[in-house]
Amino acid sequence: VPPYTRSVLPNGTVLLVMPRKDVPLIAFTALLRGGSVADPQSKPGLASITAGLLEKGAGARDAFAFADAVEGAGGSFTAAAGTEAITVSGQFLAKDQELMIGLLADALERPRFDAAEFDSLRKRRIEELKAAKDSDPSGLIRLYGRRFLFGDHPYGSPSSGSERSLAAISRDDVLGFYHANFGADRLTLIFAGDVDAAALTQAVTRAF
């Protein structure tokens, strides 16, 4: 493991910083404990929909403005739900550190969950599941292989959910999942790249 610093912010968030000065970039990953295992049994895919909406507008920025801020800086920003955690990852130029931290803090603490974006994302995810079932056989294994191994255990449900379960998910479900499962004490933030560990820690503490 490269040299790193570890600290705990006043709000309980764990912060890991790995300075690396050879390239003018900063990469980040935010890990929030509780991914699809926290989905209600009748609504697999709720964590995945919630995670997907984190990059569809936050704080003062709607989805277009959020994407424009990321792309305008030549950065990347993605969010997804795994079995045990929701992960938000990205990379920006070191000179855009303040923007990067601001976008991340907005996404995690002030997501908009706009109704139109929810409807659009849910529809797209359902269409993707339909297409996967109609594609090559590996798509079927990806969707249903875990069910054969874990049965009705939460591990047996694909993080993506099913056509039926996604259709049953409402925006209120997303809001409820967010308030029940997102919290500073469940969050680990990891930064690596062209950073000063002390300065970054101060900036993250202010933002979060």
Task: Name each model-derived stretch.
Residues 1-19, 23-29, 190, 196-208:
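Proteolytic maturation boundary segments
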Residues 10-14, 20-22, 31-37, 54-59, ...:
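Solvent-exposed coil/turn segments that connect beta secondary-structure elements
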Residues 12, 30, 48-50, 70, ...:
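Buried hydrophobic packing residues in well-ordered domains
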Residues 27-94, 135, 157-159:
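M16/MPP (pitrilysin/insulinase) zinc-metallopeptidase core fold and M16-derived inactive scaffolds
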Residues 35-40, 110-115, 197-198:
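Short beta-strands and strand-coil junctions in structured, solvent-facing domains, enriched
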Residues 56-60, 91-123:
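M16/insulysin-pitrilysin zinc metalloprotease superfamily fold
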Residues 67-72, 112-130, 142, 196:
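Acidic/histidine-enriched alpha-helical segments
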Residues 100, 132-184, 204-207:
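Scaffold signal of the M16-like zinc-metallopeptidase fold and its non-catalytic homologs
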